[in-house]
A protein has these predicted regions:
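Short aromatic-glycine motifs in intrinsically disordered, low-complexity regions
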Residues: 64-80
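Acidic, Ser/Thr- and proline-rich intrinsically disordered linker/docking segments
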Residues: 1-56, 78, 84-141
Length: 141
């Protein structure tokens, strides 16, 4: 197994490939503490202030996600789903989010190809553990 770590900023990025899981886990733990918590806090503060964030074709707001239903004929349809209407899961190298009652309304995000998907996943998992109606309630204010 090869473990890949990709990190960077708006202009540069670096990629590291590791063979040992212990080294990979240690690196990821330190990277999360150094950067992940700050990114998570910035997203939550932005959401609280009314900002929206795009991940692929999906748009995240404080109250839920706007997902895109792809149509074979005609233009695609955008559907807003509140956090309580959504479900998440993982596939091979991807994070997925979709509407509970509609298997055709879902978005898939590549961990390697899209920025900050781990932060998005962490925020949603923490939110569902804690509960609430707004993602920014994780700030505890």
């Amino acid at each position: 197994t090869t473990y890949s770590i990709i990190f960077g900023n708006g202009s540069n990025y670096a990629s590291i490939e590791l063979k040992k899981e212990a080294i990979y886990s240690n690196f990821i733990d330190r990277l999360w503490r150094a950067v992940g918590v700050r990114l998570l806090t910035e997203y939550l503060e932005g959401l609280r202030d009314g900002k929206k964030y795009r991940f692929g074709s999906a748009v995240m707001s404080d109250h839920g996600m706007e997902l895109e239903r792809k149509k074979l004929f005609g233009s695609n349809e955008r559907v807003f789903c509140r956090w309580g209407e959504l479900v998440i899961w993982n596939g091979a190298g991807v994070f997925c989010i979709g509407k509970k009652e509609d298997k055709k309304l879902a978005a898939t995000f590549s961990y390697q190809e899209e920025d900050n998907i781990h932060v998005l996943e962490a925020a949603i998992r923490m939110f569902w553990k804690r509960g609430g109606d707004r993602l920014s309630c994780l700030l505890g204010e």
